[in-house]
Amino acid sequence: MGKRDRADRDKKKSRKRHYEDEEDDEEDAPGNDPQEAVPSAAGKQVDESGTKVDEYGAKDYRLQMPLKDDHTSRPLWVAPDGHIFLEAFSPVYKYAQDFLVAIAESVCRPTHVHEYKLTAYSLYAAVSVGLQTSDITEYLRKLSKTGVPDGIMQFIKLCTVSYGKVKLVLKHNRYFVESSHPDVIQHLLQDPVIRECRLRNSEGEATELITETFTSKSAISKTAESSGGPSTSRVTDPQGKSDIPMDLFDFYEQMDKDEEEEEETQTVSFEVKQEMIEELQKRCIHLEYPLLAEYDFRNDSVNPDINIDLKPTAVLRPYQEKSLRKMFGNGRARSGVIVLPCGAGKSLVGVTAACTVRKRCLVLGNSAVSVEQWKAQFKMWSTIDDSQICRFTSDAKDKPIGCSVAISTYSMLGHTTKRSWEAERVMEWLKTQEWGLMILDEVHTIPAKMFRRVLTIVQAHCKLGLTATLVREDDKIVDLNFLIGPKLYEANWMELQNNGYIAKVQCAEVWCPMSPEFYREYVAIKTKKRILLYTMNPNKFRACQFLIKFHERRNDKIIVFADNVFALKEYAIRLNKPYIYGPTSQGERMQILQNFKHNPKINTIFISKVGDTSFDLPEANVLIQISSHGGSRRQEAQRLGRVLRAKKGMVAEEYNAFFYSLVSQDTQEMAYSTKRQRFLVDQGYSFKVITKLAGMEEEDLAFSTKEEQQQLLQKVLAATDLDAEEEVVAGEFGSRSSQASRRFGTMSSMSGADDTVYMEYHSSRSKAPSKHVHPLFKRFRK
């Protein structure tokens, strides 16, 4: 008996741990398929075996990292474990940061010192935008305060020696394997599988190698001018020149010259069979030469150009230009992911990419609201005619005839069950089109199975992923490198905030003490109803009501988020505010959102988790969170993004947006809250802890008497376990919803007292396996 109890306890603990760190879609995360082809070098890690560790676990790097004489003038520390630390107060910070964003993953970026980490995937992304192995090692040596450890040099060479050397280019609708290294092409052609993929002429002989020469600009962007930072001349003025070592000074002077000069590149290529592209890509990955996908859209004469251009009023911000420069080079488009904060203008980046390629474009979002907003963005920023935009959702199915830009959702394309006749016709049309560009919005949310389904259903030459939070709790996000492409650019949240491109947000965690009656029940109950008890805590309700009243007096626009539908309805109905959740119709949603934007009498709305992503509400400047999804870092960042859009007439020095997370004290919610804040803290945000809201006692608030609190408690206790569960959003991939759920019930439930209906289903006999049934009995059943 003891063993069984212990096993049950272990099972419960594992479930609890899983819930704390889970994401909405982590079960079917990218890379769960063991057949996914990934270069073996991608799994390599920096070797730390030579590092001494003292009795407290601290690492001693003194012997491996001798300081240079002029170390105070250099901005980087490169540790033997692959972590790089950057001084944000260095005079050459702008240049060093641009270089580190290209070669490493950001770990933490507070005010004064930033932390990055070298990974195989980040180095793969670096070579994909044109950096060579020698460039990376040379720049690191020059910028580092110490000698760069040999292990780091070996790791960089291992990961970059073959990456980025070979490209798959589509020219005149013919596929070519291209490289600027003739020896690599010869090495690939010695492989029998690749020789089989090579195109042959009518006599059965392999086509000749093609040698081309073209001019291109340096892959390193001139960060200073593009990011609003100091130019080289300003950094190297007479006063500052003494602070910068001569080799760094000469290096940046040379870097500016390289930026202005065009360099000549000679490439060797051979044509391959179109039907064997997938096999070719897998074989090249196996040979440690992964193919970088590039689309020569200017020379694509088969697919017609579409009539689209940016309006003169569309002015790109410096960081948006920089991200697009990483995507477009030498007149070609690279596939990859661009990471920008919520509210920083990801949609404009997508529209500009479509205007640059000027081929048929397919945009995929994660909700019907997202589809409507993308259509509005295309009409706002580009010259495209309304008749050329086609929407494909469950509510809106525009006729695709003469369409240049199609906008749909992942669930519509990945739908596997029977469709209506009209939807089937649109799907057939989507499949037959050859798309120049596919824009994947909120790219972090899609599981691998859905990716493969979407990517095999529609054919696109170039794929651009857009997201604000390239994080997942299961660390499978890195597999997007080979599903879409490498990370092309990632912006610094704090820099954008300081430059006024996004709002300056005051983040606060408000601690709400549990009322004695609620806490007594919370300790006693072990079911999911505990979630309802700390969400419906009367003191949390009062804090929420006080904050709404306070900010409505300031004419602020307030969004209140709740993952739990029971709590959402109770709060909204009690406070007489409009609310949006899963079953709310599309028409009602748009009406509520339009009123919130333009009606001065509607200043507060309540939204469930359907509003986590793709809700464009630039007017909102206050967000209150009353319940959330476990310890999800991504959800916290996405919700902060609802108030991140730059405000009109804002002063950069003052806080102009507020993010409140209401937490019931001494409950599991406090542990979840700490975990949720990790991503935002890593971006440089700080959370202020408020234990008492000043002026709350003077306000006339609900649940101020024991009787009212007792009535609320009885209502919560009368709720079912189903009410304690989070909302399941329709079309949400990888959610753990199923058709059946196990929960405690009562006999009154069986008779329909709480709107529950007891039903039994019997599977059809015709569907039962009958291969082992004797033929004689089969005849009797007919």
From Swiss-Prot:
Protein name: General transcription and DNA repair factor IIH helicase/translocase subunit XPB
Region (Disordered) location: 1-51, 218-241
EC number: 5.6.2.4
Keyword terms of this UniProt record: ATP-binding, DNA damage, DNA repair, DNA-binding, Helicase, Hydrolase, Isomerase, Nucleotide-binding, Nucleus, Phosphoprotein, Transcription, Transcription regulation
Function text: ATP-dependent 3'-5' DNA helicase/translocase; binds dsDNA rather than ssDNA, unzipping it in a translocase rather than classical helicase activity. Component of the general transcription and DNA repair factor IIH (TFIIH) core complex. When complexed to CDK-activating kinase (CAK), involved in RNA transcription by RNA polymerase II. The ATPase activity of XPB/ERCC3, but not its helicase activity, is required for DNA opening; it may wrap around the damaged DNA wedging it open, causing localized melting and twisting that allows XPD/ERCC2 helicase to anchor.
Compartment(s) of residence: Nucleus
The organism of origin for this protein: Pongo abelii
PROSITE patterns: HELICASE_ATP_BIND_1, HELICASE_CTER
Enzyme class, UniProt record, top EC level: isomerase
Polar residues bias locations: 218-236
Activity regulation remarks: Phosphorylation on Ser-751 by CK2 controls the 5'-excision activity of ERCC1-XPF endonuclease; phosphorylated protein inhibits the excision activity and thus NER. ATPase activity is stimulated by TFIIH subunit p52 (GTF2H4). DNA translocase activity by this subunit in TFIIH is stimulated by XPA, ERCC5/XPG and XFP plus ERCC1.
Biased composition (Basic and acidic residues): 1-11
SUPFAM superfamilies, per the entry: P-loop containing nucleoside triphosphate hydrolases
